[in-house]
Design a protein with these regions (language model features):
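Positively charged, solvent-exposed patches that mediate nucleic-acid binding
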Residues: 1-126
């Protein structure tokens, strides 16, 4: 039984080849404070896989990187319903990478607003 707002392991992008393909062939965009990459492929079993990244170059302390990734995951988890509906409707696999690209430690509300905007853009471009 699936929980309505879950982020299971199957929805995380963990394959090294898939990550390389996403960064090599994916379309990119920028919504402050994120640079994002999206790769859409046709599929018989539509799914979404997501990657969250906070570069060590910008945030030296691991606890700050972990805090930012936790905020990113939570914002995605609570706002991914429209994306999942569009994926099922169009029958595509979508890989998304969110790369936090500022040195500021932003509040959850700012991060959530940006992720909502990115998910809306990805959903529109189906």
């Amino acid at each position: 039984m699936d929980k309505p707002h879950a982020l299971p392991k199957s929805e995380r992008l963990s394959s090294l080849t898939a990550v390389r393909r996403l960064f090599a062939d994916g379309a990119s965009g920028f919504v402050y404070p994120f640079r994002y990459m999206v790769l859409k492929t046709e599929s018989t079993t539509p799914s979404v896989e997501v990657l969250f990244s906070v570069p060590k170059r910008n945030h030296k302390r691991a606890n700050k990187r972990n805090t930012l990734k936790r905020r990113m995951r939570e914002a995605y988890r609570l706002n991914n319903d429209a994306l999942h509906a569009a994926i099922k409707e169009h029958g595509k696999d979508v890989d998304i990478a969110f790369v936090y690209s500022t040195k500021d430690l932003l509040q959850y509300k700012t991060i959530e607003h940006a992720i909502r905007k990115i998910l809306a853009e990805v959903t529109e471009r189906m």
